[in-house]
Amino acid sequence: IDSSSGALGNATYAAVGEVVPIISTAPVDAALRMKWLDRLFEAIQEDDPPYIEHLGDHWGDLCATSELASVWADQLVPTQRNVLRDRQRGNYAFFSGTTLCYSALFKAGRRDELLELLALDPRPIWQYLIWGARVLAARGQVDEAIAYVREHAGSTTRLETIARFAEDALLKVGRRAEAFDQYALLANQANSHLSTFRALAKKYPELAPDKLLGHLIASTPGEPGKWFATA
């Protein structure tokens, strides 16, 4: 059982981030990779508390090829459809392979099918609906992707989470001014004004410190003194 600080969960999350690129790029044949994935899938099913569930977000990358990802999608989609039918009937239904399914569909290039499944979910949580936004962003429909998460995100989704996605999507297509003006402050809020200022200065080096400071002061009326302390 994890401590109240969440140290074990944080360490496991970090470990997943380190392991995924190693497995994804390992020069092995499809048969061996499938054995690896079978073992990982079994581990995810038995993961309680769910320390390694984050692996599901990377399932497409772990498959390494679109062909293997499609094989996994074929295995996971039927169960996912059944779960969504139950949810539409108002029943509680959960499948620990949902993120794996969506990640595999994305990697396999089966983007329309992914959107179709998401449309069947009456209350998709952030970890699921983000895949629909990724599909739209990958198609170059950045504004639509941002609108998608704004429309479908539930009340439990923090505004900071939405802002981080929107900022990142805009930055990836070079729309830096919009990313900064509309989402940067909310997306990069840290535990102190100084930390927030430093994070923004690092991410937006094109902004002179005085201009950045002026924007932050204007964005938070009534708190100029707190920002001046960062200068």
Model-derived regions, located:
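Eukaryote-biased, non-catalytic alpha-solenoid scaffold regions
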Residues: 1-231
